[in-house]
Amino acid sequence: MTDPIRTFKEQLNTWGIQKTPFVFLVDYLAEKPLAWRVDHIDSTAIRYNLNGFTNVIGSKSDLPENILFQKSPVAFSEYQKKFDHVISNLRAGNSFLVNLSAPTPIQTNLSLADIFEHSDAPYRFWKKDHFVCFSPEIFIKIKEGKFISSFPMKGTIDAALSDAQNLILSDPKESAEHATIVDLIRNDLSIVADKVWVERYRYIDRINTNDKVLLQVSSEIAGILPENFNGEYGDLIMKLLPAGSITGAPKPSTQRIISEAEEYERGYYTGVMGYFDGENFESAVMIRYIENQNGNLIFKSGGGITASSQAIHEYQEIIDKVYLPIRHAS
């Protein structure tokens, strides 16, 4: 029986060494990774726009005059049970930070292809009849096969709140959560890079959604790859997965806690998507993700939990993250 991980790594390694452009996906559990040579992709089944690297040409389709977008979040009582399981593990010292997610049924009069086409997000991917992802979060970039950087995104607030930027940057819980992830990513990059440093710490991005503007907090961690790195991107990416920002720290015990608490399959949600253009490699974390489950649309979203987190605030955050980055969608 073919080992999908081995096949995936061999594909990316070979194409990277040969400088052959490719696009790839890795699911959260790294059980069903997929990779395609760019010149072999059927755009009727796979579409991507990864920070401008795209197989989509031509004008956009028209949207309905009135865009419908309704969400039916999990009941707070159900979320509270998952949250309590996470908190008990945090207090027992089994983790410092856990990214807890939940599935939210949605209804919309847009197709997944419409959402892909019109979403205002730097990293977008559409897989026919399966999912659409419109992510704002970079995972890693590698320039000229030498310089590596990662951009963990941790911390979200409604920009309409009074003094929102200062509020989130001065919040002790948010600060501790972000510091934990930066430390984790710095350690992760040290697995593949010789020298690692924090280039930018806790900078703010504005994200426009269908019903509000959100502020997101990110950091940039940079490093230099060994001189003998020759484009073995399959080996490199698998050493860094899963992404720290969507698991927590430490990773192994935190993934166990996530599995126990969430009780559903993330699938490609919180996995990684990316491309290699023959010279530069770029990837994104698959957050902001809608999945087609037998004709029903499920939006998966999550947030980081620490020992000082409050359930009602975390519950509201996962609801706030269920949005379309399309103006006038309501």
Residue ranges and their predicted role:
Residues 1-330:
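Extended alpha-helical targeting/anchoring segments
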